[in-house]
């Protein structure tokens, strides 16, 4: 696991160099089992979808040393919705429900194997300040696309601050960077921060909106949301 190491220490370490060499030799690394199963069944995989990514230039597949072009950041586990398909690993609000109603949490987990409001075994990884500093120094200057998700990516000041930091950093050319969002699109500003003055500094913005039905179905499934708004 690279969880205790900085991104720049992991990207080109011996383990990842070996993975690239295996892929060049048409060998499946053990950590790629999900993509292997999907592709051998004739389905698209995360790997094949990434290869068709139109927002980044083609990598140099012959080199063992790479520069990251496509970066994914999850800046928060908080969300302003409590969607019924989600759980505490991706939404801290569900974990709070479990703490507030421990009897219900225990009953759901023990009798129904329903752990959506239990403390998650693994939470999504939120980058620390040390990780962000490393990314700005060693990764982001070469990046061509950054995807923000969460939680709800617009529901944290850290996302807006990260965009502003990129704009202010002389080593980062934001006009070469496309922004990608996976969002419920219920907000574009948060606690005095807004994307409106920030987005024009970037090459482009691509937004995927989670909807899941209309009208009353939307309001039921996406608890906390209002379809009319």
Give short role names for the model-derived ranges.
Residues 1-53:
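Accessory C-terminal segments flanking Radical SAM cores
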Residues 29, 34, 49-66, 105-118:
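Juxtamembrane luminal stem/stalk of type II transmembrane Golgi/ER carbohydrate-processing enzymes
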Residues 33-34, 81-85:
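C-type cytochrome heme c attachment motif
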Residues 36-38, 86-92:
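Detector for the c-type heme attachment site
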Residues 43-58, 91, 95-99:
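Short cysteine/histidine-rich zinc-coordinating motifs and their immediately flanking basic loops
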Residues 54-62, 125-137:
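A Trp-anchored, charged/polar loop motif used as the substrate-binding/catalytic surface
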Residues 68-78, 89-127, 141-157, 169-191, ...:
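Core AdoMet radical
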Residues 132, 159-168, 192-196:
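Short, well-ordered amphipathic alpha-helices
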């Amino acid at each position: 696991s690279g969880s205790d190491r900085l991104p720049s220490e992991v990207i080109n370490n011996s383990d990842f160099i070996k993975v690239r060499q295996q892929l060049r030799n048409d060998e499946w690394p053990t950590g790629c089992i999900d993509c292997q199963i999907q592709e051998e069944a004739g389905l698209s995989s995360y790997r094949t979808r990434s290869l068709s990514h139109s927002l980044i230039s083609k990598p140099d597949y012959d080199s063992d040393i790479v520069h990251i072009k496509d970066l994914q950041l999850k800046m928060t586990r908080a969300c302003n919705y409590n969607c019924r398909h989600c759980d505490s690993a991706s939404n801290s609000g569900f974990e709070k429900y479990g703490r507030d109603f421990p009897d219900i949490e225990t009953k759901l987990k023990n009798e129904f194997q329903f752990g959506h409001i239990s403390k998650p075994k693994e939470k999504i990884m939120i980058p620390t300040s040390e990780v962000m500093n490393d990314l700005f120094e060693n990764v982001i200057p070469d990046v061509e696309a950054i995807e923000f998700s969460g939680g709800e990516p617009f529901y944290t000041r850290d996302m807006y601050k990260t965009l502003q930091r990129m704009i202010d950093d002389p080593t980062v050319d934001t006009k070469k960077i496309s922004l990608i969002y996976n969002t419920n699109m219920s907000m574009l500003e948060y606690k005095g921060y807004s994307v409106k003055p920030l987005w024009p500094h970037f090459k482009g913005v691509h937004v995927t909106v989670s909807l899941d039905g209309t009208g009353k179905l939307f309001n039921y499934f996406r608890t906390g949301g209002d379809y009319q708004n």
